[in-house]
């Protein structure tokens, strides 16, 4: 997950089991890459009417701040359990955790978030945070969910777009670091997002189009296998719905890597929808790679 002189992994925490898992993953990433770890917690005053008449009564601010500090201290201990000598920095702030993570992503190597929070409302909130961060961050975002199936492959979704090229780069780096095989999956459904729900629809594919799609995958991978000769690569091309195929692969992958935007127009919207679906439903951790900034 290389980017220009960024030397930190940033993780957002809320005290939930999901965020504890995110801290462990973030600490592992930081350790493997010799980076420092920044753990952040956004103070949430919404339940107490931030700025309202109850804000200053009963020591609400002090209580929420103390709770936030305790969450950060516990997260720091989680990180030290992974690596006792890791460089860890913690910080509290008031406001939107999603916006804060997006701001910090400007200078981070990678941002890590959990996929669910503490309780139903928090789970919905953290899920929204994950979607917002993966949609707007300036660096790759790891959404920790499901199981990192030990011994499974790193799986990357490929569609031939510039963002997909960045996802391929991240996927090869991760596969090499993890000594894992890489599965490059190209799923196309140019006849529309629901066209291939009926298996008979495959007969509608124009002659030669399937060969063109195999060429898209081959061209996308050109040069990468030479750069990473240690990575065993398997290529898979499907005429299907991208979301369904990638979700199926997530059941046996240790990591799923996708771009957040596709080839533009309809396909761009489709891949954006696909990445959001994976953030919300994949069975393994997901890395969402953002487009290059103009």
Name every feature range the model reports, one short phrase each:
Residues 128-147:
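Short, structured interface segments
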Residues 1-5, 18, 59-62, 77-111, ...:
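Structural beta-alpha unit
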Residues 112-115, 140-146, 287-290:
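Short beta-strand elements of ligand-binding domains
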Residues 57-70, 203-213:
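A short acidic, glycine-rich active-site loop
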